[in-house]
Amino acid sequence: MTTTNFEEYDDPILYDKENDAYLLEIPLLLKWAAEKQGPIIDLACGTGRVTIPLAKNGLEMIGVDLHRGMLNEARNKSELLGLPIEWIEQDCTKLSLVTKSNLIYSVGNSFQHFLTNKAQDELLTSVNNHLELGGVFIFDTRFPSVEELLQPANEEYWKSYTDLEPQQTVDVFTISNYDSLDQVQHYTTIRKYKNENGQIINEKRTNIRLRYVFPKEMERLLHAHGFEILHLYKDWEETPITNDSYEMVYVCKKMREHSA
């Protein structure tokens, strides 16, 4: 993940408004946390959307992210709640933590922010280096279906929500363009803010690039970095993967040491 792909995360408050209610990962992570002792590492933790709920369950948490603004917001939230979470500003591809863990996870499809083969290799090497032998790595990434990759290149409606501060309706649209050679989707997100009369009073655009990995490609990638795939699901409810999946949730076990 690089600081040149951060536009979508430049406003941590907006990120929380749009994503804080999503907590589907928690049950599966709690299930695996119950089997593992010691601190748990949340890679690309953002504002602590998942880190904080797990800490509320009494787990020892370490959150790592490269984005200082997101990390500061996470720290502010955990301090208000009196939660002793360790927040660390580091690049996940160059991890240098004093702690090794039996459970590392990354949620929110953060794996897709590692755009090149080199970045993916460095990330998985970092994870391997900070996992105990037999430790578990859990992460998700969007499924590269035809529908997902061939989204229209024109402006398309996605969703609407209400921003309570101030009281505004926000209509969200997307434009996407898939680069088949690099397996990278270029997204533009357009947020149109409306007043109580339905008039558009503001518009914001952000850009982001996301790398897609195919299942067989991921299988070989994980094996090459010392991991065995224990489970592959289509969602966080542990539903078996199918051809019409929207995402892939991997539960992997470290089988051997790996160095770059």
Where are these regions (language model features)?
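Conserved class I S-adenosyl-L-methionine
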Residues: 1-38
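Class I SAM-dependent methyltransferase SAM/SAH-binding core
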Residues: 51-94
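A short acidic, Gly/Pro-enriched loop at the edge of an enzyme's catalytic core
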Residues: 96-103
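SAM-dependent methyltransferase
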Residues: 141-216
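C-terminal lobe and adjacent flexible extensions of AdoMet/dcAdoMet transferase-like proteins
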Residues: 209-260
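Class I SAM-dependent methyltransferase "Motif I" SAM/SAH-binding loop
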Residues: 44-48
